[in-house]
């Protein structure tokens, strides 16, 4: 009546835990980075909004860039979740590969969000006093955003290695 669960040497029963952990780390850490970036830069935007309300729309760039970081984590989490199946053997190699994918994009987006938050907060406040700083601030924000993109690229490369393609 009951079906016996067989355990393979290369596909132990605990291997999917690492894949699920990678999926969770990708979402949790990248959303944490997006939240930090949004909160820190949002403080600067609210600070200048009381003095120069006309600058608020132009100052929303750091908030938008922080939100993109959560999308990076979402993409990797969906790809990891697509590789998990209860009916197929899931090797320990794939479990560790998916864990490293999640940690890679998660920590990259966390550090990127922190950088965007600091640059966005200080940049918006200084932009209020000197509008010529806008281009330089946007360039620094782009370089900060690219840190999260690098993590996603490495996670995608790792994910394709884990799937055997």
Swiss-Prot record:
It is found in: Vacuole membrane. The chain crosses the membrane at residues 17-37, 60-80, 99-119, 137-157. The keyword Glycosyltransferase does not apply. The record marks 145 as: Essential for proton translocation. GO terms for molecular function: proton-transporting ATPase activity, rotational mechanism. One of its GO terms (cellular component) is vacuolar membrane. Proton-conducting pore forming subunit of the V0 complex of vacuolar(H+)-ATPase (V-ATPase), a multisubunit enzyme composed of a peripheral complex (V1) that hydrolyzes ATP and a membrane integral complex (V0) that translocates protons. V-ATPase is responsible for acidifying and maintaining the pH of intracellular compartments. This is V-type proton ATPase subunit c'.
